């Protein structure tokens, strides 16, 4: 029997599936067993790496999965979560029909969840939506979604909200994780997302991790970095964090710094570059310009908070002023080696070695960061400072060099950022506050002038406050779990959700904490139960086809959005003055205007592949996903956001945009790699008209909350390898649940001894906002310094975000989950 590598891996997957099911297959029968399984490509459902998988289906179920050997991202590998992908779909408590709180046969906020039809669910929703808009205007209704919905779903929801409801009150949970990176990209380069790609890994000579535990959070990329490090003795790895985690095992330089002092370290490096004449002056003079940022900008707390009252420049937090190199030099001069050591606690020699990595003109350096950088009340500044370092040294937009923000969700880039599901964004980096951008969107969407408004909605944290304060009445949460994942849930989120005047809808495959706090649960198709597309951290867009049907009456998010649009007319949602000027739109449903506009419904069912499942398209009578994508792609073609044709992505293992003349772009802004850089330009940061990037001078400013006598410990929250976010999927995989069944609190042994605590003790962790009961770990994988504890938020039985502070970066509005003050004592 001769098997190709691909066939061998498929057979391996068949064996794995049988083993997981408790079956034993003789080796000679493996190929026969595999032949009964239908295989197709898909994208992993978890992090933003974008690993490709082969999915095996049989008898209408997903029975196996395997890393795709033809995929450049992961090259046939999966992490522990990826290996168990099939099992995320078959938890015993899958939601299979809409469930509405009812009493005596009608909706009641305090009623019991009762099965209803989709029509009853949508009629109830529509009634609440219309009442909220009548009372409070378009921003009386809100959508909170995620970077886990597909590109098609993100586009459909953004269009329904911004055009149909004329409301910009739509935000993703990427606000909690990627907003600071996106804002800093836009401010620095005039365009979002990294200029490099994963190919940098095999060419870099130094890797610097800023607040990123890639070993557990991006393990496939970490395996590539490990291979690079161990195969070349000249390659170095530096890891910076407030505690020691598994990524430190590979580190040549370990930097454990005091919370929030990464700003000091970054400015020290810039000072070192200047003092040691390590500036690439030719690059800086040709390709950059200098600005200084506004300071004393507050912490994104409620306006009445003393910290906000005290801050001088809350209203101008994002302002940048013209500056020059000398002003930057003067600002960073105080960040000496002595000061950086004193404030951060990092040994001087280690700080200096890190600075030398960046200063060495012959050393190719890639900087990676995730939530440790972004979930930060000065996260935008932190992002700017790392861009400063790469711009000052010219180590950017070339193979093996560059700043690289890693995403945590599979389509935080593709859906949240590129599609534009933030309150201020439209597709392809357009924004609702720009009249020309609104006009372009209205033209593409075939809308009358003035339909899209410039009034911003409530960002993620502000949505919770608005519900609590009665400034918003309806929230539709889709494909996320904010009642567990959001900050300060006891004081800010829960009160608004259970406010009797508010109506909360949650679309999810499982009965999450959010579902149980809601008024209506909508059962959702997940992963390969629908046709989908994700955009990963390296600008790679990847497609998959529907491979099985969803259970019961569960429907995909895109079906829910498009079907729901039928319950509204333009007369109900648009002002009379617009309709009077454009009478041809009167009386039409939002479905007719948005999705039957001659573009979204352009492609007939005959364009579906023979035998292809596509429940949404067969329901609506046209190839919905293709129509949505081609209309969406028209926003970006011709100005640096080019996407390939829809059909191309079904054939490829993903392509990195901009895709021009069928060719993807690996490194943006560099001549010879980027088709938008003209011959002779060398480098062109074409997001700005002058094609220059911004170097921003900003200082250190303290955190919003620090330990004191009563709350004497720092709290940092995050994840572990085995679980993903709030555990909605991974805790329903028996193997993953057994490997890490509940949340822990990691503490330094000395801190434990001071409190009379021992490893394994049940402890109470309390902040000014709430408390949880957990279990102490003083010996495990995470080794924290004295004065700090680390915990995770995957455990619905502990709800760690009762502790966290709802402080945000005042510019990006991203939440700081990494720093607040707590106390720990033995639980009764």
Curated annotation (Swiss-Prot):
It comes from the Bacteria. It is an enzyme of class 1 (oxidoreductase). GO terms for biological process: cellular respiration; Mo-molybdopterin cofactor biosynthetic process; nitrate assimilation. Its cofactor is [4Fe-4S] cluster; Mo-bis(molybdopterin guanine dinucleotide). One of its GO terms (molecular function) is iron ion binding. Mo-bis(molybdopterin guanine dinucleotide) binds at residues 81, 148, 173, 177, 210-217, 241-245, 371, 375, 481, 507-508, 530, 557, 717-726, 801, 818. InterPro entries: Asp_de-COase-like_dom_sf, CT_Nitrate-R-NapA-like, MoPterin_dinucl-bd_dom, Mopterin_OxRdtase, Mopterin_OxRdtase_4Fe-4S_dom, MopterinOxRdtase_cofactor_BS, Periplasm_NO3_reductase_lsu, Prok_molybdopt-oxidoreductase. SMART domains: Molybdop_Fe4S4. Keywords: 4Fe-4S, Electron transport, Iron, Iron-sulfur, Metal-binding, Molybdenum, Nitrate assimilation, Oxidoreductase, Periplasm, Signal, Transport. The keyword DNA repair does not apply. It catalyses: 2 Fe(II)-[cytochrome] + nitrate + 2 H(+) = 2 Fe(III)-[cytochrome] + nitrite + H2O. Its main location: periplasm. Residues 37-93 form the 4Fe-4S Mo/W bis-MGD-type domain. It is found in: Periplasm. Substrate binds at residue 793. Catalytic subunit of the periplasmic nitrate reductase complex NapAB. Receives electrons from NapB and catalyzes the reduction of nitrate to nitrite. Belongs to the prokaryotic molybdopterin-containing oxidoreductase family. NasA/NapA/NarB subfamily. NCBIfam families: NAPA (TIGR01706), PRK13532.1 (NF010055), TAT_signal_seq (TIGR01409). Component of the periplasmic nitrate reductase NapAB complex composed of NapA and NapB. This is Periplasmic nitrate reductase. The gene is napA.
